[in-house]
Amino acid sequence: MQTTEPMTPPAPLASAQTVIDLGAIDHNVRVLRELAGSADVMAVVKADAYGHGALPVARTALAAGAAALGVATIPEALALREGGITAPVLAWLHPPGTDFAPAIAADVEVAVSSRRQLEQVTAAAAEVGRTATVTVKVDTGLSRNGVGAADYPEVLDVLRRAQADGAIRVRGLMSHLVHGDDPENPFNGLQGQRLADMRVYAREHGVDYEVAHLCNSPAAMTRPDLAFEMVRPGISLYGLSPIPERGDMGLRPAMTLKCPVALVRSVHAGDGVSYGHRWVADRDTTLGLLPIGYADGVYRALSGRIDVLIKGRRRRAVGRICMDQFVVDLGPDADDVAVGDDAILFGPGANGEPTAQDWAELLDTIHYEVVTSPRGRVTRTYLPAGQQD
């Protein structure tokens, strides 16, 4: 995805774009900071900040008071460093063959999930000639990534020796919730207790973690008892409710997906639209062509199921969504719509446009998937904090 800097002219009319409201990011970080109490906020900007652009989001989050940044992979962390980010950055997912040396050289904190990874990090630190900052990721019930209880004692042994040798600095202990979006689920408390117990066990065996963190977005907003010294929100940074049934939870969605109307044309009753003529006009009407399709992140499964906001009115998509384009029914009285007018596919919803949550419900998925889908030819433009479209 291409990115334009704040305040640059909009992309050519043939292009779709996501407009990212950095003021919303700023607002959301401040909401999360207040809810976190004395705990720090680690802003998760993995996957290119959930499709919002890692560098602009990272800068905004740090300016709003986030203490650190979290990403999945080392290349994501290094991209932040190359972009001038000097704040603490933690990377926690490492495929086989990962070279940890560049991360250590760039002062990127590395989370390890096994004895093997820890030994690789220690070896890389010796190679670089620099102390590595390490967090231990433990499995407290998700059964995904992380050191299990059975392997934890031997990992602590390696950790203690490496720390004594000056190869590593032991920074944190982290885990991830199974039922974060179900705040009252008793398993959340069990995971919190397991993490606390593993911290105590480590201290009794010569390893003292500086911080522990467990809370994702929903827990950061609803379970202050599980905050430890740091919370690790992701989706809430971008203004999407981590518990949709609770409403917006005081958050402001940051992403709007839009494109210009590329063509306006009239059709007669009985005329079919797009591949297979799955939609046939039941009256004389006017159609609008939108230059965005499934190659750009508009799911083909949404064919004939979504509305698009044009000139303050919702217009229904008709016919098949194609690779590069789809068609909307503007209605027989569409004299107000012209080529170049904005078509809002989804956004915050404040002006009646569909939202990412609307798409998620139609697709039987989550809004995380929706906002990470715009890609390829979709350009990205930013509204600085304090400016609205």
Curated annotation (Swiss-Prot):
It is an enzyme of class 5 (isomerase). Its EC number is 5.1.1.1. Substrate binds at residues 144, 323. InterPro entries: Ala_racemase, Ala_racemase/Decarboxylase_C, Ala_racemase_C, Ala_racemase_N, Ala_racemase_pyridoxalP-BS, PLP-binding_barrel. GO terms for biological process: D-alanine biosynthetic process; peptidoglycan biosynthetic process; response to antibiotic. Pathway: Amino-acid biosynthesis; D-alanine biosynthesis; D-alanine from L-alanine: step 1/1. One of its GO terms (cellular component) is cytosol. Keywords: Antibiotic resistance, Isomerase, Pyridoxal phosphate. It catalyses: L-alanine = D-alanine. GO terms for molecular function: alanine racemase activity; pyridoxal phosphate binding. Disulfide bonds: none annotated. The modification N6-(pyridoxal phosphate)lysine is found at residue 46. It comes from the Bacteria. Its cofactor is pyridoxal 5'-phosphate. The active site is at 46 (proton acceptor), 275 (proton acceptor). Pfam families: Ala_racemase_C (PF00842), Ala_racemase_N (PF01168). Catalyzes the interconversion of L-alanine and D-alanine. Overexpression due to a natural mutation in the promoter is responsible for mediating resistance to D-cycloserine (DCS) in mycobacteria. Belongs to the alanine racemase family. This is Alanine racemase. It comes from Mycolicibacterium smegmatis. The gene is alr.
